[in-house]
Amino acid sequence: MSDSKEQRVQPLGLLEEDPTTSGIRLFPRDFQFQQTHGHKSSTGCLGHGPLVLQLLSFTLLAGVLVAILVQVYKVPSSLSQEQSEQDVIYQNLTQLKAAVGELSEKSKLQEIYQELIQLKAAVGELPEKSTLQEIYQELTRLKAAVGELPEKSRLQEIYQELTRLKAAVGELPEKSKQQEIYQELTRLKAAVGELPEKSKQQEIYQELTRLKAAVGELPEKSKQQEIYQELTRLKAAVGELPDQSKQQQIYQELTDLKTAFERLCCRCPKDWTFFQGNCYFISNSQRNWHDSVTACREVGAQLVVIKSAEEQNFLQLQSSRSNRFAWMGLSDLNQEGTWQWVDGSPLSSSFQRYWNSGEPNNSGDEDCAEFSGSGWNDNRCNVDNYWICKKPTACFRDE
């Protein structure tokens, strides 16, 4: 056994990294081969097998190293390509930003334009402007009509007064009332254009002069009262004109004008109803007759006292619409059979027709009057009913 020599092969060295380079270098540390001694045979040739394997391993490692180096050299190129792509993206974003900035401004201008179009349409439909324009046109036509009447000097003054009245009316706060005044002036124009007597024209001129002074100081309640009085006098003056058809027309127009001024100048509290210069309240709760009188006094009013057929019809309609039995300020508590209002005035004989059939019958000591159905009924005063209060509108109340 000592004669034979053992083949010894130094194994392939470990791969190491050369710290002096930025790349990676792999190499075999030592390749030592032990020559075989003895006979050259197939067995001896086979002793070279490990050497072949080592060469193959070295070749494989060299190929891997080359591939790694290729990839490493490609990295700066890809980084450069990525940087150029970022530059392109940045430029595109810059252009997009500028475009969006212009688009936003343009869209805002478009929006402003549309708003102006809508505002133009809205302003064009404003009732105040159109109504004032119509009032101006009507007064211009009235000027032409009045200018053709016989008394030039007086009619010219009337025209001037109406012009000033136009300016005063143009400053009134409620647009709907401006429209009412415009309609009334239109009717008045037609009536004045056909007045037959110069003396009556003079009276109208004087009344319009007073009306101008009153309208010029409209905010004061005392002046509102003056307007009412002047219109009443004007109504009386026109009522004396000889032409009956024109009298009636002008009277009706002045009545309507008075109503329009009352609605414009006078106000009722919330939940109260305006009618012919007064405010009316129908309660939502029930009390006996005496407590109803007290309830009205507590709000500066009076359990309703009826003064005219028009007022009776209005109140009867209000009561029937609400389907409520309601106390009025009428009783015969002081003397049985003698009906008297709470203000001390007696019941007019012309009002007897408003009692329901068979009433008053004093059945069961019934001494207080109520609205019942389509007329009046007497009832016991301790019965709980709704009640109706009445008071003048604010513009006619003494300060």
Swiss-Prot record:
Disulfide partners: 265-395, 268-279, 296-389, 368-381
Region (7 X approximate tandem repeats): 108-269
Domain C-type lectin: 274-390
Alphabetized Pfam families for the sequence: Lectin_C
Cytoplasmic compartment residues: 1-49
Intervals, Extracellular compartment: 71-399
Domain of life of the organism encoding this protein: Eukaryota
Motif residue range(s): Endocytosis signal: 14-15
SMART domains, sorted: CLECT
Membrane-spanning residues: 50-70
Annotated GO CC locations: membrane
Sequence repeats: 108-130, 131-153, 154-176, 177-199, 200-222, 223-245, 246-268
Molecular function in Gene Ontology: D-mannose binding; metal ion binding
Main subcellular location: membrane
GO biological process, one term: adaptive immune response
Subcellular location: Membrane
InterPro entries, sorted: C-type_lectin-like (IPR001304), C-type_lectin-like/link_sf (IPR016186), C-type_lectin/snaclec_domain (IPR050111), C-type_lectin_CS (IPR018378), CD209-like_CTLD (IPR033989), CTDL_fold (IPR016187)
Glycosylation sites: 92, 361
Subunit and partners: Homotetramer.
Role: Probable pathogen-recognition receptor involved in peripheral immune surveillance in liver. May mediate the endocytosis of pathogens which are subsequently degraded in lysosomal compartments. Probably recognizes in a calcium-dependent manner high mannose N-linked oligosaccharides in a variety of pathogen antigens. Is a receptor for ICAM3, probably by binding to mannose-like carbohydrates.
Record text about domains: The tandem repeat domain, also called neck domain, mediates oligomerization.
Designated name of the protein: C-type lectin domain family 4 member M
Lineage: Eukaryota, Metazoa, Chordata, Craniata, Vertebrata
